[in-house]
Amino acid sequence: MPPPLPLLLLTVLVVAAARPGCEFERNPAGECHRPPAADSATCVDLQLRTCSDAAYNHTTFPNLLQHRSWEVVEASSEYILLSVLHQLLEGQCNPDLRLLGCAVLAPRCEGGWVRRPCRHICEGLREVCQPAFDAIDMAWPYFLDCHRYFTREDEGCYDPLEKLRGGLEADEALPSGLPPTFIRFSHHSYAQMVRVLRRTASRCAHVARTYSIGRSFDGRELLVIEFSSRPGQHELMEPEVKLIGNIHGNEVAGREMLIYLAQYLCSEYLLGNPRIQRLLNTTRIHLLPSMNPDGYEVAAAEGAGYNGWTSGRQNAQNLDLNRNFPDLTSEYYRLAETRGARSDHIPIPQHYWWGKVAPETKAIMKWMQTIPFVLSASLHGGDLVVSYPFDFSKHPQEEKMFSPTPDEKMFKLLSRAYADVHPMMMDRSENRCGGNFLKRGSIINGADWYSFTGGMSDFNYLHTNCFEITVELGCVKFPPEEALYILWQHNKESLLNFVETVHRGIKGVVTDKFGKPVKNARISVKGIRHDITTAPDGDYWRLLPPGIHIVIAQAPGYAKVIKKVIIPARMKRAGRVDFILQPLGMGPKNFIHGLRRTGPHDPLGGASSLGEATEPDPLRARRQPSADGSKPWWWSYFTSLSTHRPRWLLKY
């Protein structure tokens, strides 16, 4: 006779209560390590090195995985995974994922109570970071299960990434009654900068987004805010512009100008400003306010007005980032002496990678290879002038020697676009900041000012299609806060006018006779020994000064096409010049390459600057799943564990 139902239920409950806790290793389905229902706990100091930058200082044992001591936590495969995530994912999603994991391994404890991390934070990170795990054939870690170890906002959760986001400080909060278009003209810490950029992108989500191009040596995100009618997508014949600030950590004016510019573009777009709406609907604009956030922290520690001339200039590796790019200018001068040799899109020499390359520098170079930038400006401080390439003298022994590029006329036009509408650059007073440049109209060839190698502007011009100028915003590298509003007023129109010059010259699409786009076709201009190449969609942009130009389009396997182009002096938009290439009967050998350069492996990955496929990346290749069923390459990180190896990371 079966027992009565209440007695049966009681028996089941007793057996379940007596059942020993399981280990995840034995139960991959995940039916173990469930957090205890009670949230009361005894708080202890947080002592995990990998979690030292968490937003709290106290935790408790057992943790949410039932680890009962520091020794058990540090010996666990979960903790080892957090320790090596940065290397495994090449900096992607880190430190975000690491801090998320810390919230499980070392839960937040306050006043004798455990606080759980928010589920929506976990879900948001998983959506963004899942592709990074898929790329290395690794399963999503079980202890980052958003439904098991995380909870809802209405249950009193907290944001484990709040320290990264930078909480809204009292002096950052906007006074009540002010419109959302209000801009606070103050210095921004790293956390405040990130918060403002993300908040701005959220307000203008239909025309803006933020994204990271990498991390600094100390792990800070190199955060970009983009403005476009279709954020995140390159549109056919829509030119790409980038503005970069704070390459030297103690030169902070450019950093603040770009933070203000981001807010201004968003606000004016929402207010219906026709100029800004037209600009964002026809241009894709990328703003990187701080290329050197680590150096900024050093400079900011001394404070505005007290900063030394060089304190914080370099990055955390003590590298000057504007001397850290490949020296392609020396190679250009050599090639310029060789008849028929191409002196544009010069590949990065292999020996460059033997030296110390900053992660910030590498991130910028990879960014350039990813997006077909047309125009760029790097914002500095310490003088009041606009300089343009070349920055390295054609005679290395000469520290000051006029060394023009083949596009000298266009670079002068771009520089004047900034300087001519800047009230202080046009000030005729001899006592003004940067008075030495008055007779030159506040613009100068870089090498004619002072010569140096490894600069970012020369690299842009010689490795890509992008034309970059350098803007010195003022003689004070770290201006006091009260000077920032005036500085913005002086530079706002110059910044807008400069960005608008990307719509000068010609643009178009190169296709074959079937209408298929021709990628990496060369666009040459007679009399200017510097070609540009078409983007993957076959579109191109050629910045040109007013005048009559003979333009040639050519590609391997096609006959060249020549067109005469007239650009009127008052033309404010790029003229459209399309090319249809006809195939050659004799094949690609009729295409004139100049000196063929088959450079060595490019550590940045992807296509080379000449558009040719590079050799396979051995690092990328090893990340593919093994056909023979052996363990993936990352398994070696966990072989030191005698037991409890993380089989839960394996997909097969």
Curated annotation (Swiss-Prot):
Span of domain Peptidase M14: 186-502
Tissue expression as described in the entry: In placenta, it is present within invasive trophoblasts and in the surrounding extracellular space. Also present in amnion cells, but is not readily apparent in the extracellular matrix of this cell type. Present in normal pituitary gland and neoplastic pituitary gland (especially POMC-, GH- and PRL-producing adenomas) (at protein level). Widely expressed.
Activity-pH behavior: Optimum pH is 7.8.
GO molecular function: metallocarboxypeptidase activity; zinc ion binding
Residues in FZ domain copies: 27-160
Cofactor: Zn(2+)
EC number from the UniProt entry: 3.4.17.-
SUPFAM superfamilies: Carboxypeptidase regulatory domain-like, Frizzled cysteine-rich domain, Zn-dependent exopeptidases
Catalytic-site annotation from UniProt: 472
Annotated PROSITE patterns: CARBOXYPEPT_ZN_2 (PS00133), FZ (PS50038), PEPTIDASE_M14 (PS52035)
Span list, region Disordered: 595-629
Signal peptide location: 1-18
Cellular component, GO annotation: extracellular space
Chain positions recorded as Zn(2+) binding sites: 248, 251, 380
Residues carrying sugar: 281
Disulphide-bridged cysteine pairs: 43-109, 51-102, 93-129, 118-157, 122-146
Described purpose of this protein according to its UniProt entry: Cleaves substrates with C-terminal arginine residues. Probably modulates the Wnt signaling pathway, by cleaving some undefined protein. May play a role in cleavage during prohormone processing.
Family: Belongs to the peptidase M14 family.
Name used for this protein in its record: Carboxypeptidase Z
Lineage of source species: Eukaryota, Metazoa, Chordata, Craniata, Vertebrata
Gene behind the chain: CPZ
